[in-house]
Amino acid sequence: MNYQVLLYYKYTTIDDPEQFAQDHLAFCKAHHLKGRILVSTEGINGTLSGTKEETEQYMAHMHADERFKDMVFKIDEAEGHAFKKMHVRPRKEIVALDLEEDVDPRHTTGQYLSPVEFRKALEDDDTVIIDARNDYEFDLGHFRGAIRPNITRFRDLPDWIKENKALFADKKVVTYCTGGIRCEKFSGWLLKEGFEDVAQLHGGIATYGKDPETKGQYWDGKMYVFDDRISVDINQVEKTIIGKDWFDGKPCERYINCANPECNKQILVSEENEAKYLGACSYDCAKHERNRYVQANNISGNEWQQRLTNFDDLHQHA
């Protein structure tokens, strides 16, 4: 495989995010890179793909900048680009938590745990493990025994914690996320909220899965990623599927977006059920006039109506 996918972040001061974003986009395009990068006064958060040569040049370019000289890149091999376009966007935050009083992870953050230390935490009954990701990420794969916050956006996590604080009272709290960036700020917020013993998986799930000692142990399912790959394997010790098909509940690790462009809900569904239910999550979405699955597959009006009756069968067996 001649391509690489990079995942990285760095909390550091960027004085002019707008100008930085403009210059950075030009550099990335000149090196034929594709991906999504967010920049703000608090730092950079990115994931991109390119050939090995181009991604190596990118990493060297970043490490030559004093602000990013020690930035860690998580690297996956790939057969081609994992993105269709290149975006570099200035933002208020590089990860949106939208706190009234912001947290600076450079000054306030939870204790870093290595993969081996995190594995010990997973084995400790007195430690609470919180998944800091969204519900659809958790449903595809997560660490065994981790708590699933019922959220669809990271910014909703603090409110969920406040509502469920009794679950974590007087216990050691350890949190994890994909690459570590969300936990940097979230664990700092937990400390400010009065939680005394707070730690985080340093480098996130991506680092844990590549560690030669842990080899992804205790991870069930796949890890959701925000690129064209959709998911990647983590556990090198044992393979389990925990995702369930939206319609029939059978084991499934295939995510699609609902074919209704006004819905776009992510659901786990087999190719067979995607066709059967017109790529939609519900009857209302399946009959939507702009159904993308219907358009992409040139389904006739009669066939469309016929497949809509599959939802009647679904409700009868529910």
Swiss-Prot record:
Residue ranges annotated for the Rhodanese domain, each copy included: 123-217
Enzyme Commission (EC) number: 1.14.-.-
GO BP annotation list: tRNA modification
Family matches, as SMART domains: RHOD
InterPro entries attached to this UniProt entry: Rhodanese-like_dom, Rhodanese-like_dom_sf, Rhodanese_C, TrhO, TRHO_N
Classification via Pfam families: Rhodanese, Rhodanese_C, UPF0176_N
UniProt superkingdom: Bacteria
An annotated Gene Ontology molecular function: oxidoreductase activity, acting on paired donors, with incorporation or reduction of molecular oxygen
Catalytic reactions of this protein: uridine(34) in tRNA + AH2 + O2 = 5-hydroxyuridine(34) in tRNA + A + H2O
Record keyword tRNA processing present: yes
Keywords: Oxidoreductase, tRNA processing
Function text: Catalyzes oxygen-dependent 5-hydroxyuridine (ho5U) modification at position 34 in tRNAs.
Family (UniProt): Belongs to the TrhO family.
Protein name: tRNA uridine(34) hydroxylase
Organism in which the protein naturally occurs: Staphylococcus aureus (strain MRSA252)
Gene: trhO
